[in-house]
Amino acid sequence: MNFPSGAVMPEQLPSSRATARAMVMPLALAQFIASYAATNMNVAIGAIAKDLGTTVSGVQTAITLFTLTMAALMIPGSKLTDIWGRKRCFVVGLSVYAAGGLLAALSTGLPLLVAGYSLLEGIGSALMIPPIYILVTVSFPDVKSRARYFGVISGAGGLGAAAGPLIGGLVTSAISWRASFGLQVLVVAWIMVLARKVIDPARSGPTPRFDLTGAALSAAGLFFVVLGLLQSRTYGFAKSRQDFAIGGTVVIPEGSVSPVWLYVAIGALFLVWFFLHVRSSEKKGRDVLLPLRLFRDKVANLGLGTQTVQWLILQGSFFVVSVYLQEVNHDSPIQTGLMLTPATIGILAASAAAGRFARRHPQRWLIIAGFLVAAIGLVLLLVLVRAHAGAWRWVPGLLLFGTGIGTMLTSSVNVVQSSFPDRDQGEISGLSRSVSNLGSSLGTALVGSVLVAVKLPEGKPFAVALIMLLVITLTGLVIAVLIPQVTARTGQC
């Protein structure tokens, strides 16, 4: 039998379910720890600021820089998998991440915290996350197996994000915020031991050249776009809540258009420049960071659209509920983390069932069903917010919302990754992760702006924010309906 260029030979694939599980375990743990790192710091801000003799805003800046570093370097990091190899890139990312965690744990001031957490952990995440999804895609050729193991990884990521505030809060309260970083280092060390069982199917064809200019342009573009979205917490999304100054000179006065749009516009210009560079390079036959052919696939484009909406409503809803519970119900961060547990259970349960779902239903219908269930969950949460309901009444809405998210997250990733041959997995994986990061940032930016801008009695702004998220969820449902019924590569959608 002849195999097409870029195909994986059968002898390179996991030969049994036990082998497959041994391979997926370190990948899932890596996704867990990356998601954990993105959320656990929020409950330790005060303790870190006091211990390091810095300000709360300084620690918040470190958290922002972590997000920016990871978002900006995700696409270049994914391209390196084609040059270094997927497993090698994964292990290098783990090593850089562990070094960052150790430096952060031992930091004596804000500069070392930024170097360890913001930069090294951010770079490590950008290197280790893309290989996770590439390795699953190239190692499991059929859509049902991919769904099963993407479900495991999505569940691990959801658990890490949800458990971050809870575990981080408990560790910080019981021991120290430094112990939280130490815990990450230990987990990463364990992952590196387990990673020896990861199979990296050989990639056919010549090793591509790294497009340094494209990497710089894409990183700058994503950096400024995400920075703008994150700055909405300070300045607001539409109108600026305070003066925006550069070098002591007020550039945008309070009440004018928010500087968020200045950052986003700068980022958009860099991204336009990036795409012009890619088009010019492709015409000259040069290797590029992100081939334009990736954007000509209708299924993948719609799948990326659903991913954006999913992460937007996930982060946006968690943000709304978290702020509501702490500001209106006066719950502690740890209590808030416990209150979000039903959503986490829903995500985990649906992700664990992804393989069984994929055997019975097309991926397209799973995405549609996920949006419908998530919308019902949001409606229940909206009713509870308006009624100022007690704690236990939040369970059904959060459980349904989490179940909907878990159902469609795995399917959307599967649809996007399965739309391309093995030779394009590095690029599409980085693009997919970048889109997810943008969705997450946009979710908190939009919700934060609504909560500040809406001048209504206690609890009403939260209802408005949930209504906005419900409308966006229904928009995602429309996008999912537009996904074609069948694709040539996966055989189903």
Regions found by a protein language model. Give the residues of each.
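Membrane-interface helix termini in secondary transporters
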Residues: 47-49, 78-79, 83, 170, ...
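Transmembrane core module of solute transporters
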Residues: 20-69, 176, 255-262, 283-413, ...
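Hydrophobic transmembrane-helix bundles of small-molecule transporters
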Residues: 174-305, 469-470
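A generic transmembrane-helix signature of 12-TM secondary carrier transporters
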Residues: 31, 94, 100-101, 116-117, ...
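Helix-loop-helix hairpins in multi-pass membrane proteins, especially solute transporters
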Residues: 82-214, 422, 426
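Intrinsic disorder in cytosolic terminal tails and internal cytosolic loops
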Residues: 1-19, 204, 483-493
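A late C-terminal transmembrane helix in Major Facilitator Superfamily
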Residues: 419-455
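Multi-pass alpha-helical transporter architecture, strongest
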Residues: 195-196, 278, 468-493
